[in-house]
């Protein structure tokens, strides 16, 4: 099977809420700053909308691993914008470029887990430290948008 987009996720800015879990959408307009309408407080306030952090990408194999370890994660829970399938998470690396829909992205760097994950109902304050340790090197990859366009659920992910 060819790698493809399993799910596209975004969350509108909501006062006093963190940017996760994100909600599934069928299609997204993607600009150089990320998915239109998606809000990431950390990226916008602490990182000055760093273009290398425009998208957060996660693969379904990591979600499956975490489910097998007892964490009931669903696509979008970790704040990722794109959940990809049929691609090995550990094969992703900085500077790799991909065409997805009419967009082009470049993998930037790994996303470190943070304490905002306590907002997930199955984590909470009690388990957040264990969850952060569990997610080290598995939270997802940030990506820069090289070419704006549209991405739809089911779009093929091609390495370029």
Regions found by a protein language model. Give the residues of each.
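Electropositive, beta-rich accessory/interaction domains or terminal extensions
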Residues: 1-100, 104, 109, 116
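Short, basic/aromatic beta-hairpin or loop at an interaction surface
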Residues: 71-81, 124-139
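Short beta-strand element of the conserved SAM-dependent methyltransferase core
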Residues: 82, 98, 143-145, 157-158
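Short alpha-helix capping/helix-loop boundary micro-motifs
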Residues: 83-86, 91, 139-149
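Loop/turn positions that initiate beta-strands
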Residues: 95, 102, 148, 152-154
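Hydrophobic beta-strand signal
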Residues: 99, 106, 152, 158-159
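Conserved SET/PR domain catalytic loop and adjacent active-site segment
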Residues: 113-115, 148-153, 160
